[in-house]
Amino acid sequence: MRTSTQEAVLSAYIASIGKRTPREAAQDAAELCRLATSLNRLNEIACNSGLTERQERRKQNLQTRIKVVLERAGLVLNHFESDPRGYAVYLDLPDGSCNSFGGRECGYGIGR
């Protein structure tokens, strides 16, 4: 799924929760997609050659930053995925929507 589509879907869900204004929701969605894409890139590097200590710290920092943005936006993290063939971050959306073969249990993926 294209990032702009992911951003639009996330922005709509964040705004529907009511904790953020539409503008803040759009900013949160863009930041989440950007962070998740960076995390996915590190997953690709880890798969191909392994991560350096610096890259490991960056991965941890990205995961922490994603959790902060999710909490601020009112969304719930399902899990982080380290397999670079799929999405890097899976969320539990309020209506149970999903966009992967894992179904509702897996959640809605971003960051590919």
For the regions a protein language model found, what residue spans apply to each?
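Intrinsically disordered, low-complexity linker/tail regions enriched in Pro/Ser/Thr
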Residues: R2-T3
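Acidic, low-complexity, intrinsically disordered interaction modules
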Residues: C33-G50, R54-I110
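Short, charge/polar-rich alpha-helical segments
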Residues: V9-A36
